[in-house]
Amino acid sequence: MGVQYKLLRRIGLAVTASIALMGSVQASIVTTVGGSTGTVATGSAGNDVIGSVFGYFGSQLFADGPLRVEYTYLGKEAGDTNSFLVLGNLQFSTATSNYGDTANELVLAPGLLNFAFGANQNTPSVINGFNPGTSGVPNFFVSFYDQFGNLGALTGNSGVIAFDDGGSPADADYDDLVVRFTVSAVPEPTTWAMMLLGFAGIGLVAYRRRSKLALG
């Protein structure tokens, strides 16, 4: 009985540590680096996909820790055939993609998200990390969802990336290809190790209990 108690106590400590580690991972979010704040244009040159919302121009998207990112195609209003790439691979095209199409990226360490937009081509015209803050050239706008699902928050775990292909005439309405991004936590290796330790301990206790019943 004393041995089982000690094992259960160790399992409890392992599970507690796992939960604590997972909590710290879940606190990781995507943030913006650089750029300036403002609102997408209104009027005839307004955004036809997300409307006029507050957000960031010329900013880069940075992951604070290990994350899984899901990108969702929301739509476009553009004459050119624009593209969205993840890890250098074509994922969305305004010629073929449909609302709700998804793509994923796994981020294993803090750093820039690895996506790019192509202006009337399937190769990058603007890459996250080199997003200019001037209009008239390919660039993108970022806005975050708040807890109620409204765009315009300063930061968060979900938002939109809206592309301006810099086409002529330059309208800076950022609806030439729009995607939503949603991030979720990825447990670090130490977390998985703790969880496996806990499961192994539970299995050992169950095995010892069955052995005693068989002997009895």
Regions found by a protein language model. Give the residues of each.
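Extracellular distal adhesion/interaction modules in secreted or cell-surface proteins
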Residues: 28-157
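Short beta-strand-plus-loop segments that form exposed binding edges in beta-rich domains
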Residues: 119, 163-170
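Short hotspots in intrinsically disordered terminal tails
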Residues: 1-2, 213
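C-terminal membrane-anchoring or membrane-association module
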Residues: 204-216
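Extracellular carbohydrate recognition
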Residues: 169-178
